[in-house]
A protein has these predicted regions:
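Hydrophobic faces of well-ordered beta-strands that scaffold small-molecule active sites
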Residues: 161-165, 187-191, 222-226, 264-266, ...
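Short acidic catalytic loops
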Residues: 190-195, 256-271
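Single conserved hydrophobic/aromatic residue that forms the stacking wall/gate
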Residues: 2-7, 373-385
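SH3/SH3-like beta-barrel fold
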Residues: 104, 117-121, 129
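Substrate-binding surface in catalytic domains of secreted glycosidases
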Residues: 199, 203, 250, 273-376, ...
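Primary recognition of N-terminal secretory signal peptides and signal-anchoring hydrophobic helices
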Residues: 1-113, 135, 143-151
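Glycan-recognition patch characteristic of GH18 chitinases/ENGases
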Residues: 142-246, 251
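Second-shell loop/turn segments in exported
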Residues: 33-40, 176-179, 196-203, 235-242, ...
């Protein structure tokens, strides 16, 4: 995309390529330098501009040309150089010299290696120096004044008891009364109302204000679900462009506000690995619009496994109000062996692994109200129910 976009808690920062202008929500501002430069498919963003919205320090050095960026602050082990010495590629006096250091220079100590210490110089060179060449080793606190965005969203003061409601047509919305008649204890319902229909971020909607009104009368909030199940939609094309993401986000929020919906539930499945960064940017941007418009944002996730880390659960836990584990499909119709839809250990692992990344008060575990009956034969496995 030809637009740099950075989300704050309740604002969006946008800067067009090769321009000195940028906007914070609806307010246009200018800098005395070009904010984003492009060369072919590569974009370069001015570090001074980034420093307005991200917590880091930087210094530029020559010979060789490099930028040293400090983004982690807090305690560091430091030491001073006793006398003029050298930082080398490896431990050992025969190892090539990377940088000459002067008496009194401060070095960051990264680790001890026998008689040598791995250090980082002020100019960003990482190498090794003899322990005997250092003195005054002590911990120092490195800090920078910066106010982190407050991503506090909506937190209900009750446990969420949610059910997804499979709705496939506008007429099917009339079934809510029968669907709720035999239930008790629910406080949230998520109808399958929105689907992404093309790569430009347009959606189809079967939302119903009558449905929402009835749910509210029954004491339920409505978190409308949006899916990416249309096979004609290319997730990369949809999510890697600012314009299509923005269109999708605006359409979802507008539809929610027009129908009195309380929240949006994102059910994007089978996201390719290389689309993960674009997907989480979509979640970030959608979270801002939801926060401003008092809409609950929840995101559906698989049970954590190595192959789905690109869904960025930890970042979801910052941006979204609730992270929902789809705690099922341990075995399914296409499985090579018969087994539980959601065994105890499978569900337990899903919750525990999610809690490593997401605050407990944001986690919802979804359980399946279904069983699968398999027939196992010597040459095949058949699902019959």
């Amino acid at each position: 995309s030809d637009v740099y976009k950075r989300q704050l808690s309740r604002d969006m920062v946008k800067a067009a390529a090769d321009s000195k202008d940028y906007s914070v929500s609806d307010t246009v501002n200018s800098e005395d330098y070009t904010i984003v430069k492009t060369e072919g498919d590569t974009a370069y963003i001015a570090l001074d501009f980034l420093q307005k919205y991200a917590n880091f320090d930087y210094e530029v050095y020559k010979d060789p040309a490099r930028v040293v960026i400090t983004s982690k602050f807090g305690e560091r082990q430091m030491a001073k150089v006793k006398d003029d010495s050298q930082v080398r590629i490896l431990g050992g006096v025969k190892s090539p010299v990377l940088e000459e250091v002067k008496k009194g220079d401060k070095l960051t100590v990264l680790e001890d290696v026998s008689d040598w210490k791995k250090v980082c110089t002020k100019s960003g060179i990482v190498g090794y120096i003899q322990k005997s060449k250092l003195k005054d080793a002590k911990k120092e606190t490195i800090s920078r004044e910066f106010e982190e965005p407050d991503y506090t969203g909506i937190k209900k003061d009750y446990k969420i008891n949610l059910v997804w409601h499979q709705v496939t047509s506008e007429a099917a919305n009339e079934g809510i009364e029968d669907a709720l008649a035999a239930t008790k204890g629910l406080n949230t319902i998520s109808p399958t109302w929105f689907s992404v229909t093309d790569n430009s971020g347009n959606i189809s909607s079967i939302a119903s204000t009558d449905y929402v009104d009835y749910a509210h009368q029954c004491g339920l909030e409505v978190w409308a679900l949006v899916d990416n199940f249309d096979q004609n939609v290319d997730d990369m094309e949809l999510l890697s462009h600012t314009s299509s993401r923005e269109n999708l986000e605006n359409q979802l929020v507008n539809a929610a506000l027009q129908n009195g919906i309380d929240g949006i539930n994102v059910d994007f499945e089978q996201i390719p690995t290389d689309v993960g960064d674009h997907y989480i940017q979509f979640i970030r941007e959608l979270s801002v619009l939801c926060r401003v418009n008092n809409l609950v944002l929840s995101v559906d996730n698989y049970v954590p496994k190595g192959y789905n880390t690109h869904y960025h659960r930890e970042e979801q836990g910052v941006m979204a109000d609730y992270v929902i584990i789809m705690g099922y499909d341990e075995h399914f119709a296409g499985s090579y062996e018969a087994g539980s839809v959601a065994s105890y250990n499978y569900v337990k692992e899903g919750i525990e692994e999610t809690l490593r990344d997401v605050p407990a008060d944001k986690v919802i575990n979804a359980v399946p109200f279904l069983s699968l009956i398999h027939i196992s034969e010597p040459t095949r496995l058949q699902l019959i129910s």
